[in-house]
Amino acid sequence: MITTEIKRVKNHINGEWVESTGTEVEAVPNPATGKIIAYVPLSPKEDVEKAVEAAKAAFETWSKVPVPNRSRNLYKYLQLLQENKDELAKIITLENGKTLTDATGEVQRGIEAVELATSTPNLMMGQALPNIASGIDGSIWRYPIGVVAGITPFNFPMMIPLWMFPLAIACGNTFVLKTSERTPLLAERLVELFYEAGFPKGVLNLVQGGKDVVNSILENKDIQAVSFVGSEPVARYVYETGTKHGKRVQALAGAKNHAIVMPDCNLEKTVQGVIGSAFASSGERCMACSVVAVVDEIADEFIDVLVAETKKLKVGDGFNEDNYVGPLIRESHKERVLGYINSGVADGATLLVDGRKINEEVGEGYFVGATIFDGVNQEMKIWQDEIFAPVLSIVRVKDLEEGIKLTNQSKFANGAVIYTSNGKHAQTFRDNIDAGMIGVNVNVPAPMAFFAFAGNKASFFGDLSTNGTDGVQFYTRKKVVTERWF
């Protein structure tokens, strides 16, 4: 339930809401107004240790619960999420800032991840081959690995946690969740509904906080695996630190997603697709389109239509259904983004749509409007870096080959899209682009939860990705059994 009271956020350990043992707190503002809506604890190491102890104790019994029974609990959780999806979307808009339309879409994608987790009995099945030698059978069995942890970002406070703990718990593990201190309220509600579904205490534990919680998770000897989603520098740190302490780690990192626009594209649908990918959720998503490589033959026409349509977008509070671009998450991030826009101008790019100039009526929130640069090249910071904002760079290329070459020069390789009506162009793009997730006339090629989600190069650190069969393999260990009976 959303109230006007300033909330003091708690941890959830061993089935109970508890105050952090630390004294440090951080204010949580509504990004659309700047007004404080909550205070979140910056929990110390001791809180993480208590959560791990609770999860470790719960694992002894939870791991022995029959797999179908674990799924039945998740079906109850799924039902509760569906019944409360309007409230969940409003909490996301309140603390994250994205429009209610975007938040509602996120809720649905989170629910889809839980739907995947309910199918765990099928996904966990092993393999068997009889008579591999005379009288000898071979088989592979999958078992839970123990206490696992998830560290999640602010930009998808529902979807990304639901990628992690439902699947891990369905596999028989217990979980310690550390969500972003910038969006703690949705995490609280997810945990409340989880225990309403009837799960035993200690199966899921929530520890709020910042870097101290992250380090405590990475160094704790009883945590067997860590799932992470966030920026590239932090993902690299999480992967290196976690593996150094003997853990499995999957760390999904940053992006600089390119879209190649071919002369044979459907112009109207391509423009709307690029706008949706670049500017929805205020560009604060790792699958946002941040660079368009447009072929010279169609460049002027495409850019004219894109600019005209982008200038129609309204900026403001996400609860106003007329607004398309909500606020950025914090004032500090807004200042960082403005710095990138200024650097693009200083480096000689042409600013076609200036997101610094927005209507004063939007108020005191952390707003930057949709921004478009033309004449961008690979030497500019606005091409190189993940800005994580509604800032789109346009690079003109002579043909598909040059567009692919440009895209592959980025240090990131998360997602990439081509807009074309030519099957050969699509095939060439698919086979030669370096990206983990590829779209052909699909604006945001984020796969459904039953497929793996991960990029390449500096967009992903690890071996097994999140979601799908990769997720099940990450959260389980296999035993290969060779047996003979006399």
Curated annotation (Swiss-Prot):
Belongs to the aldehyde dehydrogenase family. IolA subfamily. Signal peptide: none annotated. PANTHER family: MALONATE-SEMIALDEHYDE DEHYDROGENASE (PTHR43866:SF4). SUPFAM superfamilies: ALDH-like. Homotetramer. The keyword Phosphoprotein does not apply. GO terms for molecular function: malonate-semialdehyde dehydrogenase (acetylating) activity; methylmalonate-semialdehyde dehydrogenase (acylating, NAD) activity. GO terms for biological process: inositol catabolic process; thymine catabolic process; valine catabolic process. This is Malonate-semialdehyde dehydrogenase. It comes from Bacillus cereus (strain ATCC 14579 / DSM 31 / CCUG 7414 / JCM 2152 / NBRC 15305 / NCIMB 9373 / NCTC 2599 / NRRL B-3711). Disulfide bonds: none annotated. It catalyses: 3-oxopropanoate + NAD(+) + CoA + H2O = hydrogencarbonate + acetyl-CoA + NADH + H(+); 2-methyl-3-oxopropanoate + NAD(+) + CoA + H2O = propanoyl-CoA + hydrogencarbonate + NADH + H(+). It comes from the Bacteria. The gene is iolA. It holds the Pfam family Aldedh. NAD(+) binds at residues 154, 178, 181-182, 231, 386. Its EC number is 1.2.1.27. Keywords: NAD, Oxidoreductase. Pathway: Polyol metabolism; myo-inositol degradation into acetyl-CoA; acetyl-CoA from myo-inositol: step 7/7. The active site is at 286 (nucleophile). Catalyzes the oxidation of malonate semialdehyde (MSA) and methylmalonate semialdehyde (MMSA) into acetyl-CoA and propanoyl-CoA, respectively. Is involved in a myo-inositol catabolic pathway. Bicarbonate, and not CO2, is the end-product of the enzymatic reaction.
